Amino acid sequence: MDIEEYYDKIYRFCYYKVQSKELAEDLTQETFLRFFDSEYKEQGMCIRYLYTIARNLCIEAYRKNKWDELSDDISDEGIEADNIVDIVFVRQALSKLSDEDRELLIMRYMNGETISDICEVTGSSRFALYRKLKKAKKEFEKLVEGGFFGE
């Protein structure tokens, strides 16, 4: 198990769900603490279990309403201005999607998870997952191409 690679994927997953750097870091750390405290021993399935823990923690955080709005700490990361606009644009488009669509797009296209892994995490069949991904991608593209600011 490559902890750093998994850590980055879980962090990105949490970050795009909660839109707060600090809360995403906390949730990622809590995900790994719960993972290592658990009795989970199945080899090769770690990332699936980590996503499940992370998703549940994000849901808990949402229910407790503990995160702030989109933080402006992007500039602290040394990213060029054009890239900041793109990042903010993508985040805002993602925020307009349903939780399920956002999760699927993050896992598949940002974290590069396999269809099999996503099926395991979500409990969907391959066929259903392909349909959901196609729908989510189409909705995302519609938001990006058509604008989502009410223009």
Per-range role (PLM):
Residues 116, 120-148:
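DNA-recognition helix of helix-turn-helix
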Residues 1-12, 16, 22-25, 102:
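A short, charge-rich alpha-helical start-of-domain segment used by transcription regulators
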